[in-house]
Curated annotation (Swiss-Prot):
ATP-binding among keywords: yes
NCBIfam families registered for this protein in UniProt: PRK04296.1-1
Family: Belongs to the thymidine kinase family.
Main subcellular localisation: cytoplasm
Protein name: Thymidine kinase
Organism: Halalkalibacterium halodurans (strain ATCC BAA-125 / DSM 18197 / FERM 7344 / JCM 9153 / C-125) (Bacillus halodurans)
PANTHER family: THYMIDINE KINASE, THYMIDINE KINASE, CYTOSOLIC
Residues at the active site: E89
Length: 204
């Protein structure tokens, strides 16, 4: 992608679980450090699946990160001489992260955010959705559906091997034991209400 010349912008890397979001974030961070740029990496403290102080991709690549409980802590620990701020699993942050990211970009920082763009229901995931609208650059990655082999853009939550209910909590930190990528047609959510108006869904 062609980069803008003025300093400070937002990049969003999004997609389903196992689509390579953290891997792509790590790749961009490493590329920047090779170029002698100062990078700070942040992650939500709730995400301790593989490491408490590293961003770790599902294939084992890793980069050191600062775990924070809330979005404003990113600003509190941000160094003004930092060129790039990278934020992994951005969907786990409170909505203050939107203002934090915007502030950093306005103050000359290249901000790289990686996160799920849809929740397990297949619905837009905040704050990723808003950040995608604000971003100068959006990269949407896809995994492979293990059921049919098609490109997978959704995340299937499994509870004891069965599809989760629509009414389950949105946030449940997990990996392959609880989630797998699915295409639109193989993605299943029990008790999911229709999004059509009643007149349309009843065929009238």
């Amino acid at each position: 992608m062609q980069m803008i010349h003025k300093e400070g912008w937002i990049e969003v890397i999004c997609g389903s679980m196992f689509s390579g979001k953290s891997e792509e974030l790590i790749r961009r961070v490493r590329r920047a450090t090779y170029g002698r740029l100062k990078v700070q990496v942040f992650k939500p403290a709730i995400d301790n699946r593989y490491s408490e102080q590293e961003v770790v991709s599902h294939n084992g690549n890793k980069v050191c990160a600062i775990p924070v409980e809330r979005a404003m802590s990113i600003l509190e620990q941000w160094s003004e001489d930092t060129d790039i701020v990278a934020i992994d699993e951005v969907q786990f942050f409170d909505e203050d992260v939107i203002g934090v990211v915007d502030y950093l970009a306005d103050h000359g920082v290249r901000v790289i955010c990686a996160g799920l763009d849809q929740d397990f229901r297949g619905e837009p995931f905040e704050p990723t959705r808003t950040l995608m609208a604000m971003a100068e650059y959006v990269t949407k990655l896809q995994a492979i559906c293990p059921v049919c082999g098609s490109p997978a853009s959704r995340t299937q939550r499994l509870i004891d091997g069965k599809p989760a209910s629509y009414h389950d909590p949105i946030i449940l930190v997990g990996a392959a034991e609880a989630y797998e990528p699915r295409c639109r047609h193989c993605h299943q959510v029990t008790n999911k209400p229709s999004k059509l108006p009643e007149t349309a869904s009843s065929g009238e």
